Amino acid sequence: MYKFFPSDFLNFEFLRVLGTAPTLGCDVGECLEAAAKIKNDDAESWYTAWTEAAEKSEDLGEQAISIGDKETARWAFMRSKDTRLLKAISKSVDDFKKACALLDSPVECLEIPYEGFRLPAYLFLPKRGTECSGRKTPIIINTGGYDSIQEELYHFTAAGARERGYATLTFEGPGQGIVLRREKLHMRPDWEVVISAVLDQLFILSQQNPGWNLDLTRIAIVGNSMGAYFALRGALDTRIKACVCSDGLYDFGKAGRERTPFFMKDLPKNFAESLLRFVLSFDFRTRWELAHAAMVLGTGSLSEAFDRIQEFTLGPQGRERPVPEDITCPVLVTNARDSIYRLEVTRIYDSLTQHKDGHTKVLWDPIGVGQGSTQAKVAALSHLHATVFEWLDRVLEVKRIPCD
């Protein structure tokens, strides 16, 4: 695979942006301009380059609005996103909402009550003419992951769903996006609690808004990377009728342990923290990952964040059985053989003990970056959409007329 940067991590993150071009998330030329300004393993140059690109795109959008060019404005606002600080992410959300208002399908901005707070959410309704004739609209809940924002999730699911007659609900839960930065709510391993709150509100809003025509008997949950872990957790709720687990890990603690020197666990906490910070000064990727973990988990130190991440497992921890063994709905599990992470896809698949191989559980293992072999299927969204929606159509009994 061609690499834009020597760093596998930075190259993956660049592909993550570039891969959204087909769904209006970026313009290829703008990405190449940004890449020329980014230094390898330099977070500051990364931020500066994308900020400049976002500001230019936002200016273009405002100009297009002033002359009535909705198409240019939609493109511009969809890609003028920046997520560094609260002020920046708030601006990103505002621009995304401007883009949504210019889409050719309805978008509802919602709030989900959760433990005294209100989680922001979007409901992307299908494009007119794509609805299933004579039936209500099936629903996809797209849960984010470790470092995504829900505005990014649009490209991974809703952009394809709205063209195929599906409704998509995205939201930001504790430890994610603006909820983390504004409300200081931190991530939790038992994500089924969050999904339960989302489903409760979805049922209430659907009853209050019959015009949405939502089918509450056909709800799927979709997640990529850490979102795949969250999706499996959410699938414990029997209101979920299908689950897409895209490139997930079974045990996040194990992933951390495999990259940590064995002697660290025997050192005094303060000394271990100092040593860890020194070692990470030479490792950009791990330094970013642990620093982000400390933020999303609300810990005061990197070593404490490392301890907390051990709780994020599909194993029996605090349960009678591992999570996958209690899932009853059909599950599509995907692999990413070119992932920069060591996935545990086979372990997840084999743990779905209530499922029949190739029937109620299916494994998709694409070969090649262009076919979807990177983590979360970045840079291959058309293949992601084709595979996921073909499977969902079958499981949720969505009937389509063959093209002439």
Task: Please place each PLM-identified region on the residue numbering.
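N-terminal cap/lid segment of alpha/beta-hydrolase-fold proteins
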Residues: T48-W50, A54-S57, L85-R135
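Catalytic histidine neighborhood in serine/cysteine hydrolases
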Residues: L352-S373
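Catalytic active-site module of serine/aspartate enzymes centered on a nucleophile-bearing elbow/loop
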Residues: I367-D404
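Alpha/beta-hydrolase active-site loop
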Residues: L185-N213, T217
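Conserved alpha/beta-hydrolase "acid-adjacent" motif
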Residues: S339-R347
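Short beta-strand/loop motif that positions the catalytic acidic residue
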Residues: I327-T328, V333-N335
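Hydrolase active-site cap/lid region
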Residues: L236-Q310, L343
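Short substrate-entry loop that stabilizes the transition state in hydrolases
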Residues: T130-T137, N142-L169, P174-L180, Y341
